[in-house]
Regions:
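Hydrophobic, helix-forming membrane-interacting segments
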Residues: 312-383
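Cytosolic-side membrane-insertion boundary helix
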Residues: 262-334, 338-342
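Beta-strand elements of well-folded, non-transmembrane domains
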Residues: 51-55, 68-70, 167-173, 233-235, ...
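Surface-exposed, acidic/Ser/Thr-rich flexible loop segments
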Residues: 72, 147-250
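Ordered hydrophobic segments in well-structured contexts
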Residues: 5-7, 44-50, 61-63, 148, ...
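A composition-biased, non-transmembrane "mature-region" signal
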Residues: 1, 237-239, 252, 257-261
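A surface-exposed beta-strand-loop module
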Residues: 115-186, 266-292
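N-terminal pre-first-transmembrane soluble regions of secretory-pathway and organelle membrane proteins
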Residues: 1-163, 372, 376, 382
Length: 383
């Protein structure tokens, strides 16, 4: 899959200033894999994007490398955070409270000491525009969409602004590579493996038309000081990390996340698998002779990439039917090859000799099982 891309443009009164290209953003991405519906539930993917940006940014480009729908009421997640203070604290894992101002557009988020941490910014239908990008030589096949987001004038005492929105991919095949488990003949009928390779601001994997649009409109790709990615899935799903980033997992609290889940989502236990990227650097300074002070600094980085696989229950009726056909055919072949021992042995051989032949076969099978399981038997005896 192509890379996601996030870029920004400063306010007009800041464009001519010599502002370094280091307006770092903090990026949050939640990937939800949920079952929607009651009688015949259907598995769907949802992507939540959150950006913590400087207040002197006026425009944001967010390129999504697949076709999606904005999801109507569920698009702007800031509304959910403004209406539920407990949910706000849960999402940011801090003890915050919100103070509304300037209508419903902004809400100041404050800590216990009443210090303003940042402002939540709602995204109404007039605050963003969707620009589709098509496959080369086609005017129907959409390969991605560019969200052009307008940040309104923020309160003067606010340094940081936070936006958060949710989208639903129209086709999951554009994002996930799915295969059956090829190294296990039987398990392949009951399980499936999905592969996710998600990238953010990886220049060489961004659509060239999108990069031309970003550069042509004088937007600057974000640098990041921190990126969080969460993959929310059913407890029966096994996630394997394929990245150098550390993975940690926890069980989501049903009562805290109930109002945040996608609409019509089947309520069940979900596990949040988390990957965080933050680049550290040690700064060493000599204070006096033989005295060195070491300070740990966090430096901005350009891109983010994560790869992981998931294995989950998935009964494949066609594959099971094929397996059943194989068993029936083998039984039919066996019955065709069956014969009576009397067809080959003279009738003078007593029945007890035939019994010895059958017993010998069982003896060979038992010996074979013991020999092949020798190491396992030794371990059991030692225990």
């Amino acid at each position: 899959m192509e890379s996601f891309a996030f870029a920004y443009k400063l306010k007009n009164n800041n464009q001519n200033n010599k502002v370094p290209h280091t307006h770092e953003a903090e990026c949050h991405i939640n990937v939800w894999k949920v079952d929607v519906g009651t009688i015949l539930p259907k598995t769907k993917l949802y992507f939540d994007f959150g950006l913590m940006i400087n207040s002197n940014i006026e425009w944001i480009y967010a390129y999504i490398p697949f076709d999606f729908e904005e999801n109507g009421r569920d698009f702007d997640l800031v509304k959910k955070l403004q209406n539920n203070n407990q949910l706000l604290c849960t999402v940011f894992n801090c003890d915050y409270r919100i103070q509304m101002g300037q209508g419903d557009t902004f809400g100041k988020v404050m800590d216990k000491e009443d210090n303003i941490k940042f402002s939540l910014h709602q995204l109404g239908s007039t605050k963003f525009e969707i620009i589709p990008f098509y496959k080369t030589g086609s005017k129907k096949d959409i390969v991605g969409k560019l969200l052009k987001i307008h940040i309104q004038e923020v309160p003067q005492d606010t340094e940081k602004v936070y936006i958060r929105f949710r989208i639903e991919p129209l086709k999951t095949t554009d994002i996930v590579k799915s295969e059956h488990i090829s190294n296990d003949f039987l398990q392949a009928a009951f399980s499936r493996i999905d592969m996710y390779d998600l990238r953010i601001n990886e220049i060489r994997n961004i659509n060239t038309d999108v990069m031309d649009k970003i550069k042509g409109d004088n937007y600057i790709p974000f640098k990041f000081d921190k990126v969080h990615l969460f993959y929310m899935a059913d407890t029966k799903e096994n996630v394997a990390n394929g990245s150098s980033l550390k993975q940690d997992s926890r069980l989501l609290e049903k009562d805290l996340w109930a109002t945040y889940l996608p609409e019509n989502c089947y309520k069940r236990n979900y596990i949040a698998h988390h990957w965080k990227k933050r680049v550290k650097k040690e700064d060493m300074r000599i204070i006096e002779e033989s005295i060195i002070e070491t300070k740990q600094l966090f430096i901005p980085f350009d891109d983010y990439r994560i790869f992981f696989t998931t294995v989950y229950p998935n009964i494949q009726i066609v594959r099971l039917f094929v397996y059943l056909c194989i068993v029936v055919l083998l039984g039919w072949c066996g019955s065709m090859l069956s014969f009576r021992l009397s067809n080959f042995l003279p009738h003078s051989i007593p029945e007890c000799f035939k019994l010895l032949i059958v017993a010998g076969m069982f003896f060979v099978i038992i010996v074979f099982m013991i020999v092949t399981s020798y190491h396992l038997i030794i371990k059991l005896i030692r225990k």
